[in-house]
Swiss-Prot record:
Matching PANTHER family: SIGNAL RECOGNITION PARTICLE 19 KD PROTEIN, SIGNAL RECOGNITION PARTICLE 19 KDA PROTEIN
Lineage of origin: Archaea, Thermoproteota, Thermoprotei, Desulfurococcales, Pyrodictiaceae
Stated family: Belongs to the SRP19 family.
GO molecular function: 7S RNA binding
UniProt xrefs under Pfam families: SRP19
Gene this chain is encoded by: srp19
GO biological process, one term: SRP-dependent cotranslational protein targeting to membrane, signal sequence recognition
GO cellular component: signal recognition particle
NCBIfam families, alphabetized: PRK00754.1 (NF001973)
Subcellular location: Cytoplasm
Protein's name according to its UniProt entry: Signal recognition particle 19 kDa protein
Length: 103
């Protein structure tokens, strides 16, 4: 993680909350809390709803450094795992709302 973020912000990769991935592939939260194939756009919207001031950055995910991907940097609220769980929960709510509205 960049020194400029240390302590105040956290770097969130979609893989960190992806229920289709194992822990060794990058998932950080329990399966029951994780989301199936989260998109960066969903994570950004969820973080906005939670007031976490998200910023999207182009970067290579350390576990697959040869692929260029996006990451989301958000304000730190409590522990990193707590923040990841909050965002995953909000993504689930977003998907449920969209499903109900037929989008």
């Amino acid at each position: 993680m960049s020194k400029e973020y240390r302590g105040r912000r956290i770097v969130l990769w979609p893989a960190n909350i992806d229920s289709t991935l194992s822990r060794s592939e990058g998932r950080k939260i329990p399966l029951r809390d994780a989301v199936r194939k989260p998109r960066v756009e969903e994570i950004v919207e969820a973080a906005n709803r939670l007031g976490l001031n998200p910023t999207v950055e182009e970067a290579a995910y350390p576990r697959s450094w040869w692929e260029q991907r996006k990451r989301v940097v958000v304000d730190k609220v409590g522990s990193k795992l707590n923040t990841l769980r909050m965002i995953a929960q909000e993504v689930k709510k977003l998907r449920e709302e969209r499903r109900r509205l037929g989008k």
